[in-house]
């Protein structure tokens, strides 16, 4: 019998359920523009306090939205930012009608309606993801696809090191000069050099505490960035520097790919697996692209802050004088081949087999024996961990 969980707000939770139930587990992410989420949440808060004026609760609603995105300082806190993009489908919850339509279509797909075919948006994002898989970058894989309004794909790109003669390195190019061959991430290396240079200058000027003043370059850097509570955490601005990498970013690679072939991308839409950084955003604007659709957030990006005049994030209504950046809605690339692969579409006489919800079966069924074994193993592991955490003797006195 299907079981639903109405809220998963940490990546660990979704990863655990996916590990236990495999293909029988589907993570559904509901999207609505920020203003809609804020208004709905403020309305619920007001209603719970027997009030009708939701406006006074906007600040509280904004606080809860930010907390849910990433609850800093808590290892098991809310972290929708790292969970949302791992979904199997993204549904539009802006209104009851759009939500019902999105969820209804997804249910038909998982119950084997092979006459449901990909939308232009799903097709484009799948190509962006396919392009991403070409990358061997040490950080992460990102892909982009530039698409005309009719769905034609005019260019794709991935984040990879450029090679002489144009384009990016392929796996069989000789010599292969991608970053993993050199054994290091050039951006991380230069960030460490920046930190070392800054700390060394502070040391020479006598600005460091005595116990830190005796440390040298590498020791200073490690003291600043290592440990459970480093002075320079991953959220510090200096550790968010991104411009020293050797790889061409996926968005730039797609734009350059079109330029090399003389293909116009004016008025096109770019589908990208992650929100563009501020370096790519300016090229997107300059190239004449009108719309950007993304899946994964990218907190390091300053695009919205730096280009308020030319970029609108989660635009909602159509904008004639700004590039709209909006989240993807539809079947995620991770489920594209599974849910859109054909099953039997006609009978022996050549008649179309139409979808019958009353007789439909799930496309994929998990082995009950296997997931029961996984559940049992997980419960034993959790029980042991809880006993060890609560008893100083590690559970020996239990």
Descriptions of predicted regions:
Residues 1-5, 9, 13:
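N-terminal helicase ATP-binding lobe
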Residues 2-3, 26, 267-269:
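Short active-site oxyanion
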Residues 6-8, 17, 21-45:
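Conserved phosphate-donor/acceptor-positioning beta-strand/loop module used by diverse small-molecule
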Residues 13, 43-103:
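Small-molecule kinase domains that catalyze NTP-dependent phosphoryl transfer to phosphate-bearing small molecules
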Residues 15-20, 280-283:
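A short acidic, amphipathic alpha-helical/loop segment
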Residues 21-26, 86-88, 289:
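Short glycine-/polar-rich loops that comprise or flank the Walker A/P-loop
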Residues 34, 38-39, 60, 65-66, ...:
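Terminal amphipathic helices with adjacent charged low-complexity linkers/tails
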Residues 72-81, 94-398:
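Zinc-dependent deaminase catalytic domain
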């Amino acid at each position: 019998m299907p079981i639903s969980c109405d809220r998963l707000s940490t990546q660990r939770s979704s990863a655990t359920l996916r590990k236990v139930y495999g293909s029988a587990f589907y993570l559904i992410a509901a999207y609505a523009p920020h203003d809609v989420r804020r208004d709905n949440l403020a309305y619920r808060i007001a209603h719970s306090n027997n009030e009708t004026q939701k406006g006074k609760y906007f600040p509280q609603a904004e606080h809860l939205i930010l907390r849910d995105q990433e609850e800093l300082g808590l290892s098991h806190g809310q972290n929708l930012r790292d969970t949302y993009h791992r979904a199997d489908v993204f549904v539009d919850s802006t209104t009851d009608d759009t939500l019902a339509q999105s969820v209804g279509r997804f249910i038909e797909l998982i119950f084997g309606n092979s006459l449901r075919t990909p939308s232009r948006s799903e097709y484009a994002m799948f190509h962006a993801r396919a392009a991403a898989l070409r990358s061997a970058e040490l950080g992460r894989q990102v892909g982009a696809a530039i698409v005309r309004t009719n769905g034609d794909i005019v260019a794709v790109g991935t984040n990879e090191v450029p090679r002489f003669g144009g384009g990016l390195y392929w796996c069989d190019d000789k010599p292969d000069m991608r970053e993993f061959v050199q054994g290091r991430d050039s951006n991380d290396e230069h960030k460490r050099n920046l930190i070392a240079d800054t700390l060394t200058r502070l040391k020479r000027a006598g600005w460091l505490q005595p116990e830190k003043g005796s440390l040298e370059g590498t020791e200073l850097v490690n003291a600043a960035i290592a440990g459970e509570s480093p002075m320079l955490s991953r959220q510090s601005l200096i550790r968010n520097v991104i411009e020293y990498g050797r790889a061409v970013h996926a968005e730039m690679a797609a734009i350059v790919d079109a330029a090399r072939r003389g293909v116009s991308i004016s008025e096109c839409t770019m589908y990208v697996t992650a929100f563009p950084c501020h370096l790519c955003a300016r090229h997107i604007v300059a190239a004449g692209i009108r719309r950007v659709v993304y899946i994964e957030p990218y907190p390091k990006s300053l695009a919205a802050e730096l280009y308020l005049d030319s970029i609108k994030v989660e635009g909602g209504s159509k904008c004639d004088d700004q590039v709209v950046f909006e989240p993807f809605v539809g079947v995620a690339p991770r489920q594209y081949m599974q849910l859109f692969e054909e099953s039997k579409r006609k009978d022996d006489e050549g008649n179309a087999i139409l979808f019958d919800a009353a007789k439909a079966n799930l496309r994929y069924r998990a082995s009950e024996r296997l997931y029961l074994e996984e559940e049992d193993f997980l419960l034993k592991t959790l029980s042991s961990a809880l006993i060890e955490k609560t008893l100083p003797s590690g559970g020996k006195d239990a």
